[in-house]
Curated annotation (Swiss-Prot):
InterPro entries per the UniProt record, alphabetical: IDEAL_dom, UPF0302, UPF0302_N, UPF0302_N_sf, Virus_scaffolding_prot_C
Organism: Bacillus licheniformis (strain ATCC 14580 / DSM 13 / JCM 2505 / CCUG 7422 / NBRC 12200 / NCIMB 9375 / NCTC 10341 / NRRL NRS-1264 / Gibson 46)
Superkingdom, taxonomy of origin: Bacteria
Gene3D superfamilies in alphabetical order: Uncharacterised family UPF0302, N-terminal domain (3.40.1530.30), Virus Scaffolding Protein, Chain A (4.10.810.10)
UniProt family annotation: Belongs to the UPF0302 family.
Protein name: UPF0302 protein BLi02393/BL02764
Length: 179
């Protein structure tokens, strides 16, 4: 079981994060500063991956990544309105709040690793589906490569039958690059 992250560790991380990265939406900075100013709220804050699966989750992104600037999830509703989410945070201080931060080199950051918690709300079969997707992609890549190789071999045979040295050399080069 993972050791709970202390309020001070979370605050230190947010300070570090705000000093090193610029969020795409200024309201995100306001939300993080508001959370830091209330220890009771910080106790309910959890930094996780895939916050869209959480009962109450926020996704915030910095300028250095391509992900969406801001999203707030509550139950089955999603909004990009930061003011609505801020209002919800103030009214529901007793509820857990799961925050996903998208920033460059997030997974190489010891500061982030120190506060990142396992997301208890990720569906159990999600990773199974991801594994299946990876295997399917590998099978597809293998099938395409096999098809291309067989096609080139047929074309090489035809070039040899025609005694077309130029086509043979071109096709043989393509075959060697494929391997």
């Amino acid at each position: 079981m993972q050791t709970p992250v202390s309020v001070n560790e979370k605050k230190d991380f947010i300070r570090w994060f705000l000093n090193h990265y610029q969020l795409k939406r200024r309201e995100c900075v306001w939300i993080l500063n508001y959370l830091m100013s209330h220890d009771s709220l910080m106790e309910k804050v959890h930094f996780v991956e895939q916050a869209e699966f959480c009962p109450r989750g926020i996704i915030m992104s910095t300028h250095c990544v391509e992900e969406v600037p801001f999203r707030f999830y509550k139950e089955n509703v999603m909004t990009t309105d930061a003011e609505k989410s801020f209002h919800d945070i103030r009214l529901n201080k007793q509820q857990d709040l799961f925050i996903q931060l998208n920033f460059r080199s997030a997974y190489n950051s010891p500061e982030y690793a120190a506060v990142l918690e396992a997301n208890p709300h990720i569906p159990k079969d999600l990773y199974e589906n991801e594994k299946d997707k990876i295997v399917a992609e590998q099978i597809l890549e293998h099938s395409i490569a096999t098809f291309q190789r067989q096609k080139l071999l047929r074309e090489i045979d035809e070039a040899l039958d025609r005694q077309d040295k130029e086509s043979f050399e071109k096709l043989a080069k393509q075959l060697s690059q494929l391997r």
